[in-house]
Amino acid sequence: MAPFAPMASGILLLLWLTAPSRACTCVPPHPQTAFCNSDVVIRAKFVGTAEVNETALYQRYEIKMTKMFKGFSALRDAPDIRFIYTPAMESVCGYFHRSQNRSEEFLIAGQLSNGHLHITTCSFVAPWNSMSSAQRRGFTKTYAAGCEECTVFPCSSIPCKLQSDTHCLWTDQLLTGSDKGFQSRHLACLPREPGLCTWQSLRAQMA
C-alpha cells in the first residue's frame, strides 16, 4: 500500500489544480433596485478590521452608522447597527473592504438575517462622496417612491424590450459598458400615472 499513497496524493493534487475556478459573478444593480430590494440601507464608516468567526465561514466588519435611510421597522428595537457580516471568501461572494480611511462614509445596502446585516460583493456598497448628488437624493427620499409600482429592467444585449408599462429599460451597460452611466447616476424609475412608470430626472426632484 505504501506506493499507492504518493500516487493518490498526486492525483488529488492534480485534480485540485485542474478544477475549474469558481469565482463569484454578479451584475451590479441600478441604485434604485439596490434600495428597493434591500432590507436595510444606511450610511456608515468602517471603523474596524475584518474579524473571522469561529466557523471561518463568515467575517464581520465593525462600523459606525451615521444615517439610516431604510430599515427602521425591520430593526425594531435595535436601530443601531455595529457590525456587518459577509462570507469569508471572495469565491462565495464575500465582500472585502479595501479602504483604510476610517473617516470615509459609505452607502451600504444589505439584507437582514437573524438580526444581523449581511452584504456580499454583489451588494451596493459605495463611497458616499463618489455618488452623484442625484443618487444621494434618491437614497435619501426619491427611490422609495418607485419601489411598490415600478421596476428597473436591465438591458445588456439587443434585442430587449419592456415586459410591462411599469418597467423602465436600463441601458447603461449596453450603451456605455458600465453600470455607472447616466441612468444610474441621474434617473429614477417612478410612477407617471396609475399603471405607468417612466424614467424621471432626480435633478427635478431636487428643485
Swiss-Prot record:
Localization: Secreted
Keywords recorded for this protein, A-Z: Disulfide bond, Glycoprotein, Growth factor, Metal-binding, Metalloenzyme inhibitor, Metalloprotease inhibitor, Phosphoprotein, Protease inhibitor, Secreted, Signal, Zinc
Modified residue annotations for Phosphoserine: 178
Pfam short name (any one): TIMP
GO terms under cellular component: extracellular matrix; extracellular space
Glycosylation positions in this chain: 53, 101
Domain NTR: residue ranges: 24-147
Residues with site note (Involved in metalloproteinase-binding): 37
Assembly, per entry: Interacts with MMP1, MMP3, MMP10 and MMP13, but has only very low affinity for MMP14. Interacts with CD63; identified in a complex with CD63 and ITGB1.
Function: Metalloproteinase inhibitor that functions by forming one to one complexes with target metalloproteinases, such as collagenases, and irreversibly inactivates them by binding to their catalytic zinc cofactor. Acts on MMP1, MMP2, MMP3, MMP7, MMP8, MMP9, MMP10, MMP11, MMP12, MMP13 and MMP16. Does not act on MMP14. Also functions as a growth factor that regulates cell differentiation, migration and cell death and activates cellular signaling cascades via CD63 and ITGB1. Plays a role in integrin signaling.
Name this protein carries in UniProt: Metalloproteinase inhibitor 1
Protein species of origin: Bos taurus
